[in-house]
Regions:
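Glycine/tyrosine- and acidic-biased, solvent-exposed loop/turn segments at the edges of beta-strands
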Residues: 16-216
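Sec-dependent N-terminal signal peptides
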Residues: 4-14
Length: 216
């Protein structure tokens, strides 16, 4: 009896924490199959004892009782297609939110660590594309300009202990400083702008003191 009450409490707790965000495993609960009933043949998913590629929604569970959701999504003709999510902590927290088109990741991709967003960007036919952003402690840690799954350039951010941005440095795909680097005083005032090209200092563009008075 005690175990039943604990399980009931946990299920209610999970529902309250996830439902506001409409997690797929909650929306799909009554209209999906357990992915344990799917098998793969030549790269396509089939339900056991069937000959047609599976189309429909699925939920994968960590446990044999179907209590802790691990992932949820849908297949179309045996390939992942549509919204897709992975979970941590028995479904309490998001791990990945993405989407697929004909078996390839396509659309917005978000990745989480212990429920906190750590990376987001866009996928196009299975390849990263456009601007990607990384986060740490809720602040932007880096950005990347990506084309056809390859990094063209990236920017690193550093911060003072008070949360104010300290530096913003731009790098090329060889990890060399390239472009305009910015530094800031602890009060948020711009300290300097410096131009680099392929790792070589080109010029000091601007420099300011703590109060915003130009020094060059």
């Amino acid at each position: 009896m005690k175990k039943l009450l604990i399980n009931t409490f946990l299920f209610s707790f999970l529902s309250l924490n996830i439902e506001a965000n409409e997690a797929l495993f909650i929306k799909y609960a009554d209209k999906s199959i357990n992915s344990s009933s799917l098998v793969e043949r030549q790269g396509l998913k089939y339900q056991v004892n069937t000959n047609s590629p599976f189309s429909g929604r699925f939920i994968t569970y960590e446990d044999e009782f179907g209590f802790c959701a691990k992932e949820a999504g849908s297949y179309r003709r045996g390939l992942l297609h549509g919204p897709y999510e992975e979970y941590a902590g028995c479904g309490i927290l998001y791990s990945i939110k993405s989407s697929y088109k004909n078996g390839l990741e396509h659309g917005t991709y978000s990745e989480f660590d212990e429920g906190f967003l750590i990376m987001e960007g866009n996928m196009f036919n299975g390849m990263a594309e456009g601007e990607w952003v990384g986060y740490e402690y809720g602040r932007i840690s880096w950005t990347e300009d990506v084309k056809n799954d390859e990094t063209i350039s990236f920017t690193n951010y550093s911060y003072y202990d008070n949360g104010q941005i300290s530096t913003k440095d731009v790098y090329n795909n060889n990890e060399e400083l390239h472009g305009i680097s910015e530094a800031y005083h602890q009060n948020g005032q711009l300290k300097s702008k410096t131009e680099y090209q392929n790792g070589t200092l080109v010029r000091l563009i601007e420099e300011y003191d703590f109060n915003g008075n130009r020094l060059n």
